[in-house]
Amino acid sequence: MNYVPSQPETARPHAAALVATAKGQKLLQTGKLVKEYKHRRVVNGVSIEVGAGEIVGLLGPNGAGKTTTFNMVVGVVRPDEGEVNYMGRDISKLAMHDRARLGVGYLTQEPSVFRKLTVEENILAILETCEMSRDERKIRLKYLLEELDLTPLAKSKAYTLSGGEKRRLEITRALVTSPKLLLLDEPFAGIDPIAVYEVQKILRRLRDRGLGLLITDHSAREMLKLIDRGYIIVKGQVLIEGSAEFLANDPKAREIYLGTEFNL
């Protein structure tokens, strides 16, 4: 079912905070990505895909190539070979801001909020870069605050927020441009278990609204609690792919990455 926010008809084209896409539609496909540094091939033919309405994880040991793969999707790193396709279009050579215009959102690992601005000012700072009227910005702001449970914190300075509240604000800012695909780098880093649970709940809500999400995080347990599918990358290649349950119980995944005593 397509998601349509309940807002005035005149404001909807600009005010919809989330863009619904038919579930299962392929949003992201990478074709045999290759990256070398100083004659060392750190990514060697990685192919992944993300559809609308699903959460996909990139997992693997440190130095396995998952971060480089993720950064090629984001646009921070350009592949030496292979393609990054978004909705059937090769975006391998596009800058990050051009990818954003097409509907690719990005939540960086580094703090991205303005500490001395309030929560609503942080969101407005992004909204003001969008082509819409002042009234439409107000409608969108109200909607985003409600969608990410930030309304009670709207007037709070960002530096007063907890780690989990800041992460919710960062996710909100990433949603301002109405992305169809959201890329999240270490969304669970630096936040406590309760905040992790809240962030997971929000990400599931976004998935259920039709967004596609690609996540990389060092917490395998929290990732596997959340994702619908995942890829375990080892030595620059996809070693195993499948559902969270499949990955958690795969003997090879447990031997090489998760550990034999791992459990969800």
List each language-model region with its residue ranges.
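Conserved ABC ATPase "signature" region
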Residues: 18, 124, 135-153, 200-204
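The feature captures the beta-strand-to-loop junction immediately N-terminal to the Walker
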Residues: 59-61
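Helix-to-loop junction immediately C-terminal to a conserved catalytic motif
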Residues: 74
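Conserved ABC transporter NBD signature motif
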Residues: 82-89, 102, 140
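Conserved ABC ATPase signature
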Residues: 157-161, 165
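Conserved catalytic motifs of ABC-family nucleotide-binding domains
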Residues: 178
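Catalytic Walker B motif of ABC-type/P-loop ATPase nucleotide-binding domains
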Residues: 182-186
